[in-house]
Amino acid sequence: MLDGVALNAWNTQCKNISDYLQPQYNLLKCLQKGIIYHHGSVPDAIRNYIEDLYKKDNAVRYLITSSTLLSGVNLPAERMFILDNKRGKSNLRHDSFMNLVGRVCRFNEIFNDETGNLHLLEPQIYIVFGNYFAQNANCEKFLKTVAKVDQKYSDKIDNVLLEGTSINGKNQIDLRQASEFLENYENGIIKGYKDRRVNTDSGKKCIMNGVNEFDIFTYEGAIQQQVDLCMNENLKINDTNTLLEKIHELFIQYIPEKDKDNLSRLKNMEARKYYSMMLDWRVQNKSYSEMIQLVVKYWQTLYRDDKTVVIYVGKWGDIKSQNSNVCRYTRILGKSQTEIVNLAIVRIKEEQDFIDNNLIKFVEVLYDLDLLEPNFYSQIKYGTNDENTICLIKNGLSLSAATLLIKKYKKYLKIDTNSSTVTYNDNLISKMNEEGENQIQIYEIQNCM
């Protein structure tokens, strides 16, 4: 158990997280025991905050993490216990294994003037062949081919554009598609190019915004016809319902059903209504805490109408849909309020990532085709049309942190929207502490200064 000083610190830390999200967040119970967990669906601001706690608070002793630790996260850990031989759905390769074990006993810890210890040059790595390891895993082979550090390995080259890649029947199509994309993105970059070129403005805009979920060359003519009709009608999209319908009409309908990014879900009208709702919250600048409440309310409304309703929850699912071998759905029935809240927290993070990484590119195409009202475009992309707030977001702040600064601390900022630069007053952080702002937002802002 925590002593008095540590308990006070824990109360403050938990209040910060509770206020930012919800009091039912499971991480709070773990934090009380000196444990934090870290995975790709932890909200970014929370993940950065708890990483800092692990570095600075001796009461936080244990970190349970997924392979997100491979993404350059450096923490002052001395021991690592590897319980699984998987990275996502694939087996952990030697290069990923070496990257993973390299996250502990970093040089800045080993050679620290105050706490450094040369014994850390031999990190303690434990591979636990237990219940979490794949049942069909060959443990001896894993030790010899993946975990053995003194064996010589050569990198596996998967990028078809690199010279060392062997081109065969399996990746010939990938090479052609990559070459088509590059040449159409920048004319003349591939010498002797003789494959397809886009012939429409719509096709070019799709290429320039990284759209690769369907064959642009096959469908660009049909897309351009629809775009011409919209332009003849002087269409300027300024609401999320129309936006989602046009994205479906112009792009989504051409995406194969088996697409890996689940964009084909938007062929379903109910899914489009859901993402229209999510985008409305962005336009309305809803906080994370508010979005959690709204998602829970939305699910409860579905449950009241149909007690057997299933909801899409991605990797957290335990129910398969028709024609699928992957569990991506679950039922509200039988779940406690705490379970529903925690499901909402991870799903909001994943839905925001889905919008930013998969959906926004189509918004960009529509904007480049002059089919979006400019202020509405800014609200969809940034959550605001205020130039100063947008400048802060471009400089690395979240919408909530940027909005807080503009609303309460603008005099501590020097913003140049023309050059997209921000200068922070040295007294900003002390003033925010004085005003009792949430330490999660203070930490985020401090890291951007």
Q: Each predicted region: which residue ranges?
A:
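Long, hydrophobic alpha-helical segments
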Residues: 119-185
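C-terminal accessory/interaction regions of large nucleic acid-associated machines
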Residues: 13-14, 27, 107, 168-203, ...
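Conserved segment of the helicase C-terminal RecA-like domain
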Residues: 89-142
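Conserved nucleotide-binding/hydrolysis micro-motifs of P-loop NTPases
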Residues: 42-43, 69-71, 86-88, 130-135
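A short beta-strand element within the Helicase C-terminal
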Residues: 64-86, 124-126
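Conserved C-terminal RecA-like helicase domain
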Residues: 1-62, 77, 86-99, 105, ...
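Short glycine-/acidic-enriched loop or helix-start segments at secondary-structure transitions
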Residues: 47, 73-75, 92, 137-138, ...
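Long, charge-rich alpha-helical interaction segments
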Residues: 205-208
